[in-house]
């Protein structure tokens, strides 16, 4: 059996009292929160869990590295954020007394495929074309360069421009000799328009394809903060391997594109570990209230597994009816809660 955990720890620089105005400031202190995060990780480290973390800030990355090293873990990290979130990224911790780290990969997810490119409109004016180029096209390009003008991006350009990193490890259990692949990812957060939702579908597709391709036929776990609610297009795509092409969030190939068509559907479906055991997704995994916005409480985090993995147990999670106020709180140092599953990888997976 193997234990897998995913936890968005909330960046050290994103829990300001001026932001989480409905939380006790004492529960927002970065050092206090990190100590509480580590307390939650202690029990899972004691079980030899493979742990995926999201929103690992630069300030916390070194301290988490030391934390995991003291417990015999390798900690793979990729930071890609911006100054305001302290360059937050993702981390994957592997207990080296339990597993042989057969292989590891760190990638900017949008670099893992070739995106379709839109061809520029060609103006053909016969013998006047050189004059058009000299007196119209070139001045426009010069003006754009001087003013730093950038035309609005479509969903393909937006999806390609995201820097979110994904991590993968191929692991072999030292005791049973079975192998499996595990990836962790933190999706972009875009939902306001149909184009935004298509960006999310593109990244959900990329994450599933990446995890399955890196595992090269081995049983596969893909876990993290997907910023998708149950039933969203990206969630449907991952869990069924399919999505109706008439869905508003189905990525449509741009007109006049060059290159190969983008493959939307992953080679196989994956299923939520919590659905396997409980018959449904967690009641919520994120509970936050930003300033005077309406409280947000819903499910955004998942542990997805391929059909050849058996899920024997999942960590019990609270119900929203039993929650008193937004997180972070004294008992929850992040605005997300930790998910965990015990899995069984079939013999012969090597």
Task: Give names to the regions the model predicted.
Residues 1, 50-188, 317:
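Structured beta-strand-rich core segments of catalytic domains in phosphoester-bond hydrolases
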Residues 1-19, 65, 69-74, 155, ...:
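Acidic, histidine-bearing metal-coordination/catalytic regions of metal-dependent phosphoesterases
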Residues 3-9, 33-64, 93, 168-169, ...:
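Active-site beta-strand/loop signature of hydrolases that rely on acidic residues for catalysis
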Residues 9-33, 115-118, 158-159, 191-199:
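Acidic/histidine-rich helix-loop elements
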Residues 17-21, 66, 104-107, 194-197, ...:
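Short coil/turn segments at secondary-structure boundaries
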Residues 21-23, 67-71, 201, 237-241:
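Glycine-rich, phosphate-binding/catalytic loops in enzymes
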Residues 24-31, 54-58, 84, 156, ...:
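Intrinsic disorder
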Residues 154, 194-205, 209-221, 226-350:
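Metal-dependent phosphoester-hydrolase catalytic domains
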């Amino acid at each position: 059996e193997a234990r897998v955990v995913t936890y968005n720890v909330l960046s050290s620089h994103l829990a300001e009292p001026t932001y989480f105005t409905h939380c006790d400031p004492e529960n927002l202190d970065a050092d206090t929160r990190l100590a509480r995060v580590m307390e939650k990780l202690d029990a899972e480290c004691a079980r030899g869990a493979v742990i995926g973390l999201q929103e690992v800030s630069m300030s916390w990355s070194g301290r988490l590295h030391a934390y995991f090293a003291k417990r015999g873990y390798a900690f793979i990290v990729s930071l890609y954020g911006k100054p305001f979130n302290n360059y937050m990224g993702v981390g994957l911790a592997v207990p080296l007394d339990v597993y042989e780290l057969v292989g590891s990969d760190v990638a900017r997810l949008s670099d893992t495929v070739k995106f379709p490119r839109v061809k520029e409109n060609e103006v053909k004016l016969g013998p006047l074309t050189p004059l058009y180029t000299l007196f119209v096209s070139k001045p426009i390009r010069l003006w754009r360069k001087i003013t730093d003008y950038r035309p609005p991006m479509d969903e393909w350009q937006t999806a390609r421009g995201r820097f979110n990193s994904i991590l993968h490890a191929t692991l072999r259990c030292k005791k049973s000799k079975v192998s499996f692949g595990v990836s962790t990812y933190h999706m972009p957060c875009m939902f306001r328009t149909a184009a935004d939702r298509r960006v999310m579908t593109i990244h959900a597709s990329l994450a599933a394809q990446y995890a399955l391709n890196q595992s090269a036929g081995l049983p596969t776990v893909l876990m993290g903060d997907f910023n998708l609610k149950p039933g969203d297009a990206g969630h449907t795509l991952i869990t069924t391997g399919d999505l109706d092409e008439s869905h508003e969030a189905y990525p449509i190939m741009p007109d006049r594109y060059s290159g190969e068509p983008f493959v939307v559907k992953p080679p196989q479906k994956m299923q939520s570990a919590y659905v396997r055991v409980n018959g449904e997704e967690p009641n919520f995994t994120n509970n936050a209230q930003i300033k005077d916005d309406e409280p947000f409480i819903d499910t955004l985090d998942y542990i997805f597994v391929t059909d050849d993995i058996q899920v024997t147990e999942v960590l019990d999670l609270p119900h929203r009816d039993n929650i008193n106020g937004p997180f972070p709180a004294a008992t929850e140092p992040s605005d997300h809660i930790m998910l965990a599953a015990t899995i069984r990888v079939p013999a012969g997976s090597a």
